[in-house]
Design a protein with these regions (language model features):
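Alpha-helical recognition segments enriched in aromatics with Gly/Pro capping
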Residues: 46-49, 60-182
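N-terminal Rossmann-like or analogous alpha/beta NTP/dinucleotide-binding catalytic cores
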Residues: 1-51, 61, 153
C-alpha cells in the first residue's frame, strides 16, 4: 500500500461514519481494465487534430517535426514500469504503435489489448466528462485561466470526442496563513 492509498482509505472510512455514501471511481483501474481503450485509440487516430488544438494556445510556434512526433498518450513500460517511453510510430488505424523506453526496452504496443497507458491530462479530462456524464465541473484558477485546461479541454471534448463540455466554475485557491502553495 502506498502513502497516498493509506490516506485515501482513512478518508473513505471517515465518510461512512457520517453516513455519506460515495461511488469511488479509480481512473487507474478504469484504464487498466480496458474501459478507455477505444477512446485512447480514437485519440491516437486524431493525434494531429489534438496537436493543432493544443498548439493554438501555445506561445511559441510548433515545428512540423513536433506535430508529427506528438502522441496524446503515455505508455507504461512493461519492463521498468515507468512512463518514460517515446512512441516512434503508429499504425494508420491507431491501434498499434512502436515505442522505446529510457530503460532501453523497445516494443510494439496494442492499445486494444495493452491497457497500462494514460491519455495526457487535457485529453483525459474531456474523455472522462463524456464517459461519466459530467454536467458541472469546478476547478482552480489554473484550470480556469484563459487558454488553461478547461478552454483547451472543452474544444477537445467537442471536436475529438463529439461531447459537450460541462458547465465550469473556476475558484481561487484557499491558503492558510503562513504556508505556501495550493
Amino acid at each position: 500500500s502506498s502513502y497516498a492509498e493509506h490516506f485515501e482509505k482513512e478518508f473513505e472510512a471517515s465518510l461512512s461514519r457520517f453516513g455519506v455514501k460515495v461511488d469511488f471511481r479509480r481512473q487507474s483501474e478504469n484504464y487498466r481494465s480496458g474501459k478507455y481503450a477505444k477512446y485512447v485509440i480514437q485519440a491516437v487516430q486524431k493525434r494531429r487534430e489534438i496537436f493543432d488544438i493544443l498548439d493554438k494556445f501555445r506561445q511559441q510556434v510548433a515545428t512540423p517535426e513536433e506535430r508529427e512526433a506528438y502522441y496524446p498518450v503515455s505508455i507504461y513500460c512493461p519492463v521498468c514500469g515507468k512512463d518514460e517511453t517515446t512512441i516512434t510510430s503508429s499504425s494508420e488505424d491507431g491501434v498499434t504503435c512502436e515505442y522505446t523506453c529510457k530503460c532501453g526496452h523497445k516494443g510494439t504496443w496494442d492499445f486494444s489489448k495493452d491497457f497500462n497507458c494514460k491519455l495526457a491530462w487535457k485529453i483525459d479530462w474531456p474523455m472522462r466528462w463524456m464517459i461519466e456524464g459530467v454536467d458541472f465541473e469546478p476547478g482552480g484558477k489554473d484550470h480556469a485561466s484563459p487558454g488553461g485546461s478547461y478552454d483547451t479541454s472543452k474544444i477537445i471534448a467537442k471536436k475529438i470526442f463529439g461531447a459537450q463540455a460541462p458547465m465550469f466554475k473556476g475558484y481561487e485557491f484557499v491558503g492558510i496563513k503562513g504556508t505556501t502553495g495550493k
